[in-house]
């Protein structure tokens, strides 16, 4: 066991994150205090919660270790979004109990305490998501707070990070105001609560000063940032800043590093972000989960959007910012999805020509309203539709990447080994999108930004050579 993450990948896998997490644990100064093992599962938003807990534990003098057997207590930060994630969480809790015996559970699955207790009655304590203080209380109970000189800092200014040093997730809000019928996030994390803009920008500045070259802005609903405060004025560095996603993006764009927006809900005011991308202030990359194209399915999901309107919106965005890359996610096999609905989705996909796409087969989630919808789709039909959908998108992706051949692109290096370097362009987020391979380039370092001549492409990835000055 190590301090680790589990993130489902939709296209390709990169081991950088786990390696860096192991290195992070080794690089932390030993404190001599009680030792904590930590397992972080699920999405980047959960990863940020783990970073916050670990930062506080280090501040209090606890030591973070890499094995079950060396730990006085093991914390498992769980995911409970879909059935496979629930099973992953329960299996991990069971492994920690078997190997160590003293386990504290937190995270999204922690909101369903009875379900955990039924399978694993021996856990020491259970808390829901972002219940940081409750987690620490459980730790204090079973691994007393070490005697620690408060004037000896065990934590870097930017806190403990579970990502490689050159990129970091920046969470701007918690919770969600939407009630999509396939989702139970609001029941676990509550309604949307935005962080003060000054607090976000201060964290971003600390991360930049620590060497971060890429900020990945995340939340449950990034484009709704500030709606809970009615987009009131906040302050950053003594200057007023409106608490909305456009103003926040403008401020982040002044830092001179890559800024990538994730989980952007398809509101009309997303239009305001595109000029910032066209001007080079933030990356021309939009992660926007459309989920489907059929009006009937979208209505059943309680999702916004009409197929023709979103297509017009995408066309308008690309006219303003031709370099724009759009990533999206979709659900096939949603209850009540007819053959006609699915064909409509495929036609929309062909028309939209999205750059990066993830697809999920609908999976019932305990507590989700969609479970009560009539006409559940068989697993066989779900699989057929999934394969058909991904084949269509694979052809789109391959054609788009072929057009990159012969161009020179800026690439951020993620990993270097004895065979060469692996990086990403602005079009690719870590863990979920494609990669750029530079065979033989063993002298580069993670975090470097280099120019690469693209020479080859497949359905998801690129190969190229370094452009030397």
From Swiss-Prot:
Species:
Vibrio vulnificus (strain CMCP6)
Signal sequence, start to end: none
Any single GO molecular-function term of the entry would be: 4 iron, 4 sulfur cluster binding
As for subcellular location, the record says:
Cytoplasm
Q: Which residues form the Radical SAM core domain?
A: 162-399
* Residues in coiled coil: none
Give the family, as the similarity comment puts it.
Belongs to the methylthiotransferase family. RimO subfamily.
Name used for this protein in its record: Ribosomal protein uS12 methylthiotransferase RimO
The record lists [4Fe-4S] cluster 1 as bound by: 43, 79, 108
């Amino acid at each position: 066991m190590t301090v680790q993450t589990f993130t489902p990948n939709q296209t390709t896998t990169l081991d950088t994150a786990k390696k860096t997490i192991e290195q992070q644990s080794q690089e932390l100064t030993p404190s001599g205090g009680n030792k904590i093992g930590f397992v972080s599962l699920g999405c980047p938003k959960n990863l940020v919660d783990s970073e916050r807990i670990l930062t506080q534990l280090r501040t209090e003098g606890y030591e973070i270790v890499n094995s079950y057997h060396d730990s006085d207590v093991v914390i498992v930060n769980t995911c409970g979004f879909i059935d496979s994630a629930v099973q992953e969480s329960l299996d991990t809790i069971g492994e920690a109990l078997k190997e160590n015996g003293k386990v504290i559970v937190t995270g999204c699955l922690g909101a369903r305490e009875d379900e955990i207790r039924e399978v694993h009655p021996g856990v020491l304590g259970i808390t829901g998501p972002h219940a940081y203080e409750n987690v620490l209380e459980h730790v204090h109970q079973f691994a007393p707070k070490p005697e620690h000189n408060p004037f000896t800092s065990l934590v870097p200014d930017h806190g403990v990070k579970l990502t490689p040093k050159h990129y970091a997730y920046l969470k701007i809000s918690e919770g969600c105001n939407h009630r999509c019928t396939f989702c139970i996030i609001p029941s676990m994390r509550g309604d949307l609560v935005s962080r003060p803009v000054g607090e976000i920008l201060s964290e971003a500045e600390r991360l930049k000063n620590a060497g971060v070259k890429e900020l990945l802005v995340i939340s449950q609903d990034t484009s709704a940032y500030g709606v809970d405060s009615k987009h009131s004025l906040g302050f950053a560095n003594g200057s007023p800043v409106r608490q909305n996603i456009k103003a926040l993006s403008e401020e982040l764009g002044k830092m001179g590093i890559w800024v990538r927006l994730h989980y952007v809900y398809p509101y009309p005011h997303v239009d305001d972000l595109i000029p910032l991308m066209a001007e080079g202030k933030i990356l021309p990359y939009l992660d926007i989960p459309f989920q489907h194209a059929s009006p009937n399915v979208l209505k059943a999901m309680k999702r916004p959007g009409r197929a023709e309107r979103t297509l017009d919106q995408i066309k308008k965005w690309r006219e303003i910012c031709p370099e724009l890359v759009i990533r999206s996610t979709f659900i096939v096999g949603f209850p009540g999805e007819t053959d006609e609905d699915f064909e409509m989705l495929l036609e929309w996909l062909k028309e939209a020509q999205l750059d990066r796409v993830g697809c999920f087969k609908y999976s019932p989630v305990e507590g989700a309203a969609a479970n009560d919808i009539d006409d559940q789709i068989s697993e066989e039909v779900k699989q057929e539709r999934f394969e058909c959908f991904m084949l269509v998108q694979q052809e789109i992706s391959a054609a788009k990447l072929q057009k990159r051949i012969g161009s020179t692109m800026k690439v951020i290096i993620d990993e270097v080994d004895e065979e060469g370097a692996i990086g990403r362009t602005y079009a690719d987020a870590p863990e979920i999108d494609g990669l750029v391979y530079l065979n033989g380039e063993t002298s580069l370092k993670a975090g470097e930004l280099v120019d690469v001549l693209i020479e080859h492409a497949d359905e998801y990835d690129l190969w190229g050579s370094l452009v030397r000055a």
